[in-house]
């Protein structure tokens, strides 16, 4: 450098080291803690300061303390208390311990790796530690593996350093919270097509110079900034705050690209050639706010942002302006988000560590049928994420009061941007289904002449439909959710039944046949239920893609899918988890109706039409049957009922009549 004589040797060495490592790729991890309450015991970030006798840990803490003292600017008196300083030194030793153990587990040499560590305290995040890790043999595909190993090591060392007295069960629970809550996170990005999370590699030197070295040092309890930093080359360990900023400035100047003043005018800009009016700016801001707030109807707009609604209503042609604004909003949501995305974004991360999927009402409904409720929920999320292929419709069918509508209504309310099929409008039944994230068909019946249009929409095809008083409009692939008490696979046009439509309709349906009647006090689904179910599935590796579904369950679901296979596995050695109930038994006396054969005893025709009633007469009351079967766990079969009926008309039980 030309001006090298004006800078210290440490500054020049650090700058040259960053230049040499500017384009090297590295993983970006964040180590953190969360405030936990276990049986009334508060555990905060500064409670992991238990004294240690480990010689290696003590040496690491001494080295960190030396770096802290050397990097302190003596012109400014630090107000950081000794307890906070000691806690940061302990965390520094723990992070390095985790880092080196993770490297050795991969059979890598620490000398072949380069790393950078910086401890910080943020306004919203509190204490956290940034770690950049790269080296020979470290590839992008290994990022998630390292995150999992570092997370396990971090939780183990935190338990050992926790000064709050905990019972063995509480220690296990704290470690579960640390591992399930991902107290070590990895920088990732979402692929536009697959919607999967992939590891995001960073440029090692650029990241340090442009981001970490520009931060202010935390010197008071009220300020936010960095505490301490270190690296594999010992180049930034002892730099004071001013020297760090100088290194960042020199690095930026050395890598500044040559600028050439250019002016490019596009055809649209030349044609417009004017400044946007205040009205245009206001409309654009309103559309952006409506999209961010997920407002898709006039009522939602009135409730969430009444000021902008009144402002548009007061303008000339206000009704048309409001209508067009909402149309742009719904179009934006329909093209940029899926129904699954709109549900998942409502999940609260703070509730996920304590969430138990088996306690949700949806899974209880599936458990009544002895189904694998994880498999059912996974299949539903795939369809909502437009990953079901031709099977683009979720069909809840069965008798009344079995939970069909409460699940469908809950999902539709969470999505918000929903179109409804109107069977009463014979000519334009799908008039309300354009620019939507989900189509809801409640109590579907015979589709008659609309069956071909219905099949096209249910298979996720892009078709054009006619609208009343308008021209035709295109419907993009949109998932459909449907509830019915009838057999929609039987299509009747006039008085003629058309069996050729039965199999094509089945090929388009995710068949969920609910047959168990719910008790009267079952209640509705909680608002947070399905968002947490989706988040739980993602955390456990059940991505909302058909590739993930086939990986876990073997094949794509079809009309005769056996939801009870594979059977649910009860977790063991988990003292904090509640037992998962996979079945709900009810007796005829509980619901006050005459006992009828259970679904498993019906023949194939009744199995396909579970809402049809058997024609066999019933000769005993509910209370009598309940008393008879109180000592058994299974319901009577057809053969048992037939035996009872014959016994009632036998010689011993024949009724006597008086002819007089």
Swiss-Prot record:
Location of region: Ori-binding: 192-196
Function: Multifunctional protein which displays endonuclease and helicase activities required for initiating and directing viral DNA replication. Also plays a role in viral packaging and transactivation of several promoters. Binds site-specifically to 2-3 approximate tandem copies within the origins of replication (Ori), unwinds this hairpin region and nicks one DNA strand thereby initiating the rolling circle replication (RCR). Cooperatively binds Ori with host PIF and probably other host factors, which activate the nickase function of NS1.
Domain notes: In the N-terminus, the endonuclease region is involved in binding to the origin of replication. In the middle, there are the ATPase and helicase activities. The C-terminus probably contains a transactivation domain.
Chain ranges of the SF3 helicase domain: 365-527
Cofactor binding: number and manner: The endonuclease active site can probably bind other divalent cations.
Single GO molecular function: endonuclease activity
Motif position, RCR-2: 128-130
Superkingdom of origin: Viruses
Broad EC category: hydrolase
Cofactor(s) it depends on: Mg(2+)
Stated name of the protein: Initiator protein NS1
Gene field: NS1
Family of the protein in this entry: Belongs to the parvoviruses initiator protein NS1 family.
InterPro entries: Helicase_SF3_DNA-vir, P-loop_NTPase, Parvovirus_NS1_C, Parvovirus_NS1_helicase, Parvovirus_NS1_N, PV_NS1-NUC
Annotated compartments: Host nucleus
Positions occupied by motif RCR-3: 211-215
